[in-house]
């Protein structure tokens, strides 16, 4: 879980954006929108959820392995590399 107020604010902003996308998707489904438009909205929700997951996971990894400079520069670089890989996978 994000530990700083700034990180928490970013995560909550993402959650609210996803909520807005879900609400728009629901309205589209209720309004019998075209399948193409609905699929596009679903893809946007999925992308936003993956972004949220990456943000929270990055925060967790950094809190667990990269706090207070107690590890070597090599470990810090490994943490950065791992986060980069996770973000690429979730795109």
From Swiss-Prot:
Give the GO molecular function terms. Answer: DNA-binding transcription repressor activity; metal ion binding; transcription cis-regulatory region binding
Q: What induces its synthesis?
A: Negatively autoregulated. Induced by formaldehyde. Also induced by acetaldehyde, methylglyoxal and glyoxal, albeit to lesser extents. Markedly induced (41-fold) by polyhexamethylene biguanide (PHMB), a broad-spectrum antibacterial agent, but overexpression of the gene causes no change in PHMB sensitivity. Not induced by S-nitrosoglutathione or bulky aldehydes, such as furaldehyde and tribromoacetaldehyde.
- Which domain of life does the UniProt lineage start with? Bacteria
What Gene3D superfamilies would the database entry show? Answer: Metal-sensitive repressor, helix protomer
Record-level GO cellular component terms: cytoplasm; protein-DNA complex
Pfam families found in the cross-reference section: Trns_repr_metal (PF02583)
Q: Which UniProt keywords apply?
A: Cytoplasm, DNA-binding, Repressor, Transcription, Transcription regulation
Query: CDD domains, alphabetically?
Result: RcnR-FrmR-like_DUF156
| Impact reported for residue 2 to A | Fails to respond to formaldehyde. The mutant exhibits enhanced sensitivity to formaldehyde
Q: Where is this site: Important for response to formaldehyde?
A: 2, 35
What is the activity-regulation note?
A: The presence of formaldehyde leads to the formation of methylene bridges between Pro-2 and Cys-35 residues of adjacent subunits, which remodels the surface of the tetramer. These conformational changes lead to de-repression of frmRAB expression by promoting disassociation of FrmR from the frmRAB promoter region. Can bind Zn(II), however Zn(II) blocks amino acid residues required for formaldehyde sensing. It is likely that Zn(II) could only inhibit FrmR activity in vivo under conditions when Zn(II) homeostasis is severely perturbed.
> What's a GO biological-process term for it?
negative regulation of DNA-templated transcription
- Localisation per UniProt entry: Cytoplasm
Q: What is the effect of changing residue 64 to A?
A: No change in activity, does not impair response to formaldehyde
Known function: Formaldehyde sensor. In the absence of formaldehyde, mediates repression of the frmRAB operon. Acts by binding directly to the frmRAB promoter region. In the presence of formaldehyde, it dissociates from the frmRAB promoter region and allows expression of the formaldehyde detoxification system encoded by frmA and frmB. It senses the toxic chemical formaldehyde directly, with no metal-dependence.
Q: Which family is it part of?
A: Belongs to the FrmR/RcnR family.
Which protein are we looking at? Transcriptional repressor FrmR
Organism encoding this protein: Escherichia coli (strain K12)
């Amino acid at each position: 879980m994000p530990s700083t107020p700034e990180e928490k604010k970013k995560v909550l902003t993402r959650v609210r954006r996803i909520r807005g996308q879900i609400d728009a998707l629901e309205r589209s489904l209720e309004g019998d929108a075209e399948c193409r438009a609905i699929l596009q909205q679903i893809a946007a929700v999925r992308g936003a959820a993956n972004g949220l997951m990456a943000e929270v996971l990055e925060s967790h990894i950094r809190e667990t392995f990269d706090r207070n400079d107690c590890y070597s520069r090599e470990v810090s670089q490994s943490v950065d590399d791992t986060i980069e890989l996770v973000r690429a996978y979730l795109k």
